[in-house]
Structures are given as C-alpha cells and as structure tokens.
C-alpha cells in the first residue's frame, strides 16, 4: 500500500484493504517517509495487529535515531534504505546500528547490477533480506529480475507494469502469469533490445 501519509487515514485504509482481501494475502505498507516518530509508531502498531508483512519507509532516511527507536518498539519488520545516503558503506551503518530489518535497493538507485549484488550480499552476511525495489522502466525491471534470481535473500519481484514513457527499450516487455514471472533463457539480459527504437530516437553520436 502507498497510502496518503496521514496516520489515522492510513490506518483506516490498511484496515479496509485487509478486510477486502482476507488474511491469506501478504500485505505491506510503504509510507513513503511520511511520518514523525509518534505517528510512525501509531501506524506500525496498527498494521502489526492487521498482520502486515513489513513496514517500509515510515520515516525520512536521515532520521536513523528514530528508526532505531521504532525498531525497538515494533515487532513488524521495518524496511528502509531505498535512498539512504552512503549507498554500500551507508547500508553497513544501518545494519550495525540495528536501524532496519531489511535493506532496499534497485539497479537504478543503487548504481547498477554489480552494486546491487554487493548490497544483497552485504545483507546476506547478516542473514537479512534485501528486497529489490521496482525498476521504473522496462530495462531496469529486467536487470532487477536477474539480480533477484541470483541471490537467496530477496523474496519478491516488485513489478509495476510499464506504460507510456516508461515502457521502452525492449521488443516485448516482461510478461507475468498469476503473479509469477519466469526466468529468461536468452543471452545477456534475456530480452530482445528494441534497436529500431534506438535508431528512431537517435540524436547524435559521440566520437
């Protein structure tokens, strides 16, 4: 869920969704850095009771002090570090300060396939998950998919079907069936690059 960022309204939304889908579906709350500590704690306790699977980005990522406090008060796993400063070395500080239960990254934000793999391995060394954020466009989604299938500590492939300007770069986009995506079997990224699009949109060539 990406709710509105107002604590009481977000709690009501979380309740309504849980009632709507029942208890079998895993639900997660992404508050998108919306709260101060008190509201973050209030929402966290509410979604714990609703059996939400994790609690993402309740506070701004500069507020490590209150993340530590929040993690001490709540049982629901906290996930943060999507845009945390310091990237690889900064993430190590989040782990050693016990400020989050799971790391977050993707090929675009983290800096590519290799840095994202390093981040996953860093989390793995502490027996933690590194859940990979959606890529935002077709090419990034495919690159994320490769990393997810190469590491043992990412449970979900977060995928928003691309539309409009974000659907580019591939002859055919990722297809999923009943919530599942199959691994590509072709070389490289495993999907055919749309070179015709690249030629049509070509502006200049750097020598």
Regions found by a protein language model. Give the residues of each.
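Catalytic core of soluble alpha/beta enzymes
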Residues: 1-140
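Flexible C-terminal active-site loop/helix
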Residues: 114, 119, 135-207
């Amino acid at each position: 869920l990406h709710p509105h960022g107002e604590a009481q309204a977000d709690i009501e939304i979380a309740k309504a969704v849980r009632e709507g889908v029942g208890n079998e579906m895993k639900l997660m709350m992404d508050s998108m850095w919306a709260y101060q500590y008190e509201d973050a704690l209030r929402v966290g306790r509410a979604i714990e009771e609703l059996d939400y699977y994790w609690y993402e980005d309740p506070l701004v990522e500069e507020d490590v002090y209150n993340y530590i406090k929040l993690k001490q008060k709540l049982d629901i796993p906290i996930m943060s570090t999507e845009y945390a400063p310091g990237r690889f070395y900064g993430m190590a500080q989040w782990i050693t300060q016990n400020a989050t239960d799971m790391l977050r990254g993707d090929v675009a934000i983290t800096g590519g396939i290799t840095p994202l793999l390093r981040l996953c391995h860093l989390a793995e060394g502490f027996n933690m998950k590194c859940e990979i954020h959606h890529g935002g466009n077709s090419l990034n989604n495919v690159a994320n998919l490769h990393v997810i299938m190469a590491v043992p500590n990412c449970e979900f492939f977060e995928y928003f079907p691309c539309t409009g300007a974000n659907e580019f770069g591939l002859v055919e986009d990722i297809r999923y069936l009943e919530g599942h995506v199959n691994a590509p079997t072709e070389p490289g990224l495993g999907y055919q690059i749309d070179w015709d699009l690249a030629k049509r949109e070509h502006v200049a060539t750097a020598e």
